[in-house]
Amino acid sequence: MSVQNICSTKAYDMLISNDNAFLVDVRTREEWQQVGIPHLDNKNKVIFLSWQLNKDFEDNFLSIVNDKIHAIIFFLCRSGYRSFIAANFITNIGYKNCYNISDGFEGNNQDKGWKQNNLPWQF
């Protein structure tokens, strides 16, 4: 199965309605601190694991979600590019229910993104 693109509003709906779904935010620590982070009531549903310049991404990912091979996993970055690469990478190691949030946290040329769609977020 290949990575599917999904908009932030649909991803949010699936995240809050499915106990087997979680979000991996692959932005940098600076982005999390300066721009904000997604907020979900269930804190265990959001994983912060930077993709950029992280040679240990796979090991770190597996140490956090090793028992969730059948989970629905949403990947998020600023605009949908890094998250797509990370989602493909994780799909290639055996996780089959991976989605890329194509409009990202801040949006892109076509779409608003998590923050501009007024989905829950915080600093």
UniProtKB/Swiss-Prot annotation:
A Pfam family reported for this protein in Swiss-Prot or TrEMBL: Rhodanese
Positions of the Rhodanese domain: 17-117
InterPro entries: Rhodanese-like_dom (IPR001763), Rhodanese-like_dom_sf (IPR036873), STR4-like (IPR044240)
TM region(s), chain numbering: none
CDD domains: RHOD_1
Gene3D superfamilies given in the database record: Rhodanese-like domain (3.40.250.10)
PROSITE patterns hit by this protein: RHODANESE_3 (PS50206)
Superkingdom field: Bacteria
SUPFAM superfamilies found in the cross-reference section: Rhodanese/Cell cycle control phosphatase
PANTHER family found in the cross-reference section: RHODANESE-LIKE DOMAIN-CONTAINING PROTEIN 4, CHLOROPLASTIC
Name of the featured protein: Uncharacterized protein RC0915
